[in-house]
Curated annotation (Swiss-Prot):
Gene3D superfamilies for the chain: Chaperonin-like RbcX
UniProt note: phenotype after gene disruption: Non-essential, no visible growth phenotype in ambient air or 2% CO(2), no change in RuBisCO assembly or activity. Non-essential, has a reduced growth rate in 5% CO(2), about 2-fold higher amounts of RbcL accumulate. Cells have fewer, larger carboxysomes, their positioning is often abnormal. A double raf1-rbcX deletion partially recovers carboxysome formation compared to the raf1 deletion alone.
SUPFAM superfamilies referenced in this protein's UniProt entry, alphabetically: RbcX-like
The organism's taxonomic lineage, starting at the top: Bacteria, Bacillati, Cyanobacteriota, Cyanophyceae, Synechococcales
Domain notes: The homodimer has 2 functional domains, a central cleft essential for production of soluble RbcL in which the RbcL peptide binds, and a polar surface which plays a role in correct RbcL subunit arrangement.
Polar residues bias (residue ranges): 138-152
Protein name: RuBisCO chaperone RbcX
Species annotation: Synechococcus elongatus (strain ATCC 33912 / PCC 7942 / FACHB-805)
Amino acid sequence: MASTQRAKPMEMPRISRDTARMLVNYLTYQAVCVIRDQLAETNPAGAYRLQVFSAEFSFQDGEAYLAALLNHDRELGLRVMTVREHLAEHILDYLPEMTIAQIQEANINHRRALLERLTGLGAEPSLPETEVSDRPSDSATPDDASNASHAD
């Protein structure tokens, strides 16, 4: 019987830092998307300039992206910082529960699929009853069907 694999306690701080860094990068990206969409409605030329700038810089490092944006357009950089902070304040309360629930649901689905594959269950999809009953029987021929319709 395989033992359950768990992260070692000394790995948790590193994993937490890496996760937080990734989340900050993602929130920076989302803030830029929100602002780009707002600008598209109010200032299409500004939205285009933000799109062009964003294509030149990677969101893999949100802080480097933000530093470059602040050098390029201070007002826009400050706006990204404000929106990013606002997003963080509103989603982080719900994130732990949502993340755990999604992981648990995904794990159940993966385990179910694995079990079905290992046991051979679900290998052949069954047809709904209506499709089965609408099919002509194997012994019926096209001539039988036309004769039955003209039997009146």
